[in-house]
Design a protein with these regions (language model features):
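Contiguous, structured surface segment used for ligand recognition
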Residues: 3-140, 470, 485-519
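Feature activates predominantly on carbohydrate-active enzymes
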Residues: 75-307, 348, 352, 452, ...
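Active-site neighborhood of glycoside hydrolase catalytic domains
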Residues: 257, 271-273, 277-373, 380-388
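Flexible, acidic glycine-rich loops studded with aromatic residues
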Residues: 359-375, 381-528
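Disordered, acidic Ser/Thr/Pro-rich linker "stalks" and the adjacent N-terminal cap
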Residues: 520-579, 586-601, 617-618, 650-654
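Exposed aromatic-hydrophobic patches
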Residues: 571, 622-628
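Short beta-strand-plus-loop segments that form exposed binding edges in beta-rich domains
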Residues: 636-644
Length: 654
């Protein structure tokens, strides 16, 4: 029963109780005065469901309410910050937050129990009685959005904030500057937007090395930004702005060329019209630092976030290596190379942010030339960078491209592109199940390191997301998997259960008109006909033993260790063969990797299930031969130890 409630993330502890609570237009909210903002948000949602005004009364008014939702606070609850307790009982719903954010999280749980479509068809809805005690595993539950490559209306961002809140995500990492566009109004430097917010062309879908020749651009005014920050704050979401430096800065340098490496041959900065990594980086001049500090001063005035993201990724060193001025700075500062100049650059910015009582976050390249002490590293490439930061005592946010880049395909590329060029993605493959399977704490070797992992974040890089519909397509439903791995400890995760709940949650997306994708379901771990297959080997990743006999050519079994003599794979057929048949077993992966094929082994059959008769030896990773009618079982027997692992493709019996 608990499994069927469409809650994502799943609460940490949920117990079903007897009975139910009936919510209707007569239900009123009784609230602690510190929760007036949260109460208004809940009341608004209930009004949309019932079509009638919801009554809210402050807690101290002892008015008798026949049907109530009570919102309360209790800092003594033995929960992490952001935790809450909730009961649904026939007399009412009670949500008690450890803090205000916790009460808000509890409200989201309640909203997920209500009907997806508004207004309700019936005048009331019955909620199952239950008790929940819930708290987040991670404090940083983030979603990133690149508004540099493409620009989206602020109204869409507000809706996105709502949807993040619905899933208890709490950090919106707003990527505001790029080679292809500067999107934040800076009063002191108006050309950043007058020039930097517009480009002359964009690659069309389907041809990334081409140009559409259309002028494109836009930016957010400071007034709009303040409104979004306040909107997010009311929903317990912190907006972490990102101002890219020293690289991904071509648009800013095009607007103010004096802050680039002006002394290099062919210097001619432009707002970029193609994707990829571009050479324009800021010059290490005192005027440039003043310029960046002025920008960051306005940024800090707009964004109350403790963390300010300064990019730091993909800053080519070619211009610094060409620039006489940059080389003089390296000499003056005793820097060995351009990597150390990058680190010098980052450290100066870190110091400036510290003077404003802010903390620097940067992509994992901020370790080039030495990681600044108090910096938080956002790990996007190899997990070894996380290890490196943890060793140095720095905090990390896990945002690895292999598991958390939502610009990757979520269904097979051929299938997507057959629907139209607008389904193009940058590349990669991240089905919802793969994201769900990611453990943000996988790099932690002990409890101390676990605590240095602040959380996990999904990335939406938008080269291939020209409009908001495409952003939705890439974000949903994968955002649900992200939310669950950010909220639930690893031992509480369960993909099959999540997948059932996701069907319920997708009804909310559909009711809101979100242009979601259809999740790609991983192949079921079942044999094709109910035959039983087992092995003495262990399974690597998701490559279940059943995949060796599931009727699908694109799945396979993969054993995740070296082989010992007498290791086996045994297939017991659902019913004995009625005629002579030919069996074939093909093992091995790509030849270039030497195989993972079976070097020494026998293919055997049995008619009584216990006496085994050899059909053939494996040769070049393959065995085949004829087996008699009445055969009940097949076995692959390893006859000598081997160093390589083992891949077994579909076993065929014809
Ligand atoms: C990145 O994807 N360049 C952080």
């Amino acid at each position: 029963m608990a499994q069927s409630l469409p809650l994502i993330p799943q609460p940490k502890v949920l117990q079903k109780q007897e009975g139910s609570f009936v919510l209707s237009a007569a239900t009123a909210i009784r609230f602690d005065r510190q929760l007036s903002v949260e109460t208004a948000i809940l009341a608004d949602k209930i009004e949309r469901l019932t079509g009638e005004k919801t009554r809210s009364v402050a807690e101290e008014l002892r008015i008798m309410l026949s049907s109530e939702i009570a919102l309360d606070l209790d800092s003594s609850l033995a929960l992490k910050p952001g935790g809450y307790e909730m009961t649904v009982a026939p007399r009412g719903v009670k949500i008690t937050g450890k803090d205000v954010a916790g009460a808000f999280a509890g409200i989201q749980t309640l909203l997920q129990l209500l009907p997806a479509a508004a207004p309700m068809a019936e005048k009331s809805v019955s909620l199952p009685a239950l008790k929940i005690s819930d708290e987040p595993e991670y404090g940083w539950r983030g979603m990133h959005l690149d508004c540099g490559r493409h620009f989206y209306p602020i109204e869409e961002l507000k809706k996105f904030i709502d949807q993040m809140a619905f899933h208890k995500l709490n950090v919106f990492h707003w990527h505001l500057t790029e080679d292809q566009g500067w999107r934040i109004e800076i009063k002191k430097y108006p050309k950043l937007t007058a020039v930097g917010a517009f480009r002359d062309s964009t690659p069309p879908y389907g041809n990334r090395n081409s140009d559409d020749g259309k002028r494109y651009g836009g930016f957010y005014t400071q007034e709009q930004i303040k409104q979004l920050v306040a909107y997010a704050s009311a929903r317990h979401i912190t907006i972490v702005p990102e101002i890219e430096l020293p690289g991904h800065a071509a648009a800013a340098i095009a607007a103010y060329p004096q802050f680039g490496n002006t002394d290099i041959p062919g210097y001619n900065p432009k707002v970029m019209t193609r994707w990829g990594v571009h050479p324009y980086v800021f010059a290490p001049k005192e005027e440039t630092f003043r310029f960046l500090e002025d920008i960051l001063t306005e940024v800090c005035d707009l964004f109350p976030s403790k963390f300010i993201h300064i990019g730091g990724d993909e800053a080519p060193k070619s211009q610094w290596n060409q620039s006489k001025f940059a080389k003089e700075v390296m000499q003056r500062e005793g820097l060995k190379n351009a990597d150390e100049l990058q680190s010098y650059f980052i450290r100066r910015i870190e110091k400036f942010l510290a003077s404003k009582n802010r903390s620097l976050v940067g992509w994992d390249e901020i370790q080039e030339g030495g990681l600044p002490k108090s910096a938080t590293m956002m790990v996007w490439r190899d997990l070894k960078w996380a290890q490196h930061a943890l060793d140095l005592g720095n905090n990390v946010v896990m945002a690895p491209n292999a598991y958390a880049y939502l610009d990757h395909y979520q269904r097979p590329v051929g299938e997507e592109l057959s629907k139209g060029a607008e389904f193009e993605a940058i590349g990669g493959f991240l089905p919802v199940s793969k994201l769900y399977g990611y453990d943000p704490a996988s790099v932690a070797r002990n409890e101390k390191e676990r605590k240095q992992i602040l959380g996990v974040q999904g990335q939406l890089w938008t080269e291939y997301m020209k409009d908001w519909k495409k952003v939705e397509y890439m974000a949903f439903p994968r955002i649900a998997a992200l939310a669950e791995i950010a909220w639930l400890p690893k031992d509480k995760k369960n993909y099959e259960d999540f997948r059932v709940r996701l069907d319920g949650v997708m009804k909310f997306y559909d009711a809101l008109g979100i242009n979601r994708a259809v999740p790609l379901d991983p192949p079921q771990k079942k044999t094709k006909d109910g035959s039983v297959i087992e092995t003495s080997l262990n399974v690597h990743a998701d490559h279940a033993i059943e995949f060796a006999y599931d009727g699908r050519a694109n799945t396979f079994f993969w054993a995740g260790r070296e082989l010992k003599k007498d290791d086996h794979i045994t297939l017991r057929l659902k019913s004995p063969l009625t005629a002579v048949a030919r069996v074939t077993v093909q093992t091995g992966g790509k030849a270039s990797q030497n195989g993972d094929r079976l070097e020494k082994g026998e293919l055997q059959y049995s008619v009584d299930g216990s006496t085994w008769i050899k059909v053939a030896d494996f040769s070049e990773g393959k065995a085949s031969g004829s087996i008699p009618a009445q055969s009940k079982a097949l076995r692959v027997l390893v006859t000598a130890p081997q160093k390589f692992w083992l891949i077994v493709h579909e076993m065929t019996i014809e």
